[in-house]
């Protein structure tokens, strides 16, 4: 489940509710500008004028959307993210679970930039959730570190024996 699925849910909502067809880039722009995962009375009133093609006439048309409306459009996909996190936590080994309770959940990737997603996950799991310092690059930077020094992989993951044998000191 990723940001692309959230974009698709926004585009589908616009098609169903407003008879407005928008492209992937417009849906992403809506998500970035007024998308939110957690209620915020002030931000929920934020509006954005969006242009697209009217589904029935085929002519260009614009509609004004609110942040609260877009949160509802994203709700099903956000619910899938919450459920995936909960399922993962349920399967987490006790030692790691204790670490997560102490340190919290760290969000990375473009989805971490959805306004309020950390608040939503904190609220739903009861575990403090924060966003990585550079969520768009931190995963690839970490992979780069492991590739530069493959022995670091042993400290990060429970690696299969054939990999442990390949990276022995």
Question: Where are the regions that the model predicts?
Answer:
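Phosphate/ATP-binding catalytic cores across multiple sugar-kinase/actin-like superfamilies
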Residues: 73-100, 146-149
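Acidic, glycine/GT-rich loop-and beta-edge segments that sit at the periphery of enzyme/chaperone cores
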Residues: 23, 42, 145, 149-169
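Conserved phosphate-binding/catalytic loops in two-lobed NTP-binding clefts
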Residues: 119-145, 153, 160
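Phosphate-binding glycine-rich/basic clefts of nucleotide- and phosphate-handling proteins
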Residues: 1-75
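Glycine-rich phosphate/diphosphate-binding loops and the adjacent beta-loop-alpha structural elements
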Residues: 60, 65-70, 95, 99-106
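Glycine-rich phosphate-binding loops at beta-strand->alpha-helix junctions
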Residues: 97-121
């Amino acid at each position: 489940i990723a940001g692309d699925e959230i974009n698709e849910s926004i585009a589908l909502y616009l098609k169903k509710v407003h008879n407005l067809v928008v492209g992937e880039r417009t849906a992403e722009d809506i998500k970035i500008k007024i998308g939110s995962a957690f209620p915020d009375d002030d931000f929920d009133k934020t509006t954005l004028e969006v242009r697209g093609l009217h589904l029935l006439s085929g002519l260009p048309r614009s509609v004004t959307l609110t942040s609260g409306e877009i949160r509802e459009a994203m709700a099903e996909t956000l619910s899938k993210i919450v459920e995936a996190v909960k399922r993962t936590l349920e399967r987490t080994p006790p030692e790691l679970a204790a670490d997560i309770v102490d340190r919290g959940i760290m969000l990375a990737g473009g989805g971490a930039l959805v306004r309020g997603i950390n608040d939503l996950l904190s609220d739903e799991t009861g575990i403090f959730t924060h966003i990585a310092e550079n969520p768009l690059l931190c995963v690839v930077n970490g992979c780069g570190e492991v590739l530069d020094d493959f022995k670091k992989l042993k400290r990060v993951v429970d690696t299969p024996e054939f990999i442990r044998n390949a990276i022995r000191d």
